[in-house]
């Protein structure tokens, strides 16, 4: 399996609604490590590392319409796996 890093910036009503907690739970179910962080501009930045297929599934879930709050858009960037996380944090 190819290991990758997914960075996704999620825009919408995603702060103060349990979005980071929900993202962490989905990421851990998929065996991913990383973090979900509130940004000052109202977005949430999701960084996930692990198997490409698991990261792709997390991205699908972020765009599914089944998240807490309301997701208006998700911008993604794929880079090399760095191995810099243990577990998945809410920041």
Curated annotation (Swiss-Prot):
**What catalytic activity does the UniProt entry give for this protein?**
an acyl phosphate + H2O = a carboxylate + phosphate + H(+)
Q: Which UniProt keywords apply?
A: Hydrolase
EC number in record:
3.6.1.7
Task: Quote any Pfam family the record assigns.
Answer: Acylphosphatase
Source organism, top-level taxon = Bacteria
PANTHER family found in the cross-reference section = ACYLPHOSPHATASE
Query: What is the name listed in the Swiss-Prot or TrEMBL entry for this protein?
Result: Acylphosphatase
What gene is this protein a product of? acyP
């Amino acid at each position: 399996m190819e290991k990758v890093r997914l960075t996704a910036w999620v825009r919408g009503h995603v702060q103060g609604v349990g979005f980071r907690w929900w993202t962490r739970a989905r990421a851990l179910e998929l065996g991913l490590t990383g973090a979900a962080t509130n940004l000052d501009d109202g977005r949430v930045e999701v960084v996930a590392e692990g198997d490409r297929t698991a990261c792709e599934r997390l991205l699908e879930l972020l765009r599914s319409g089944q998240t807490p709050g309301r997701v208006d858009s998700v911008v993604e960037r794929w880079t090399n796996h760095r191995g810099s996380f243990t577990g998945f944090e809410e920041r």
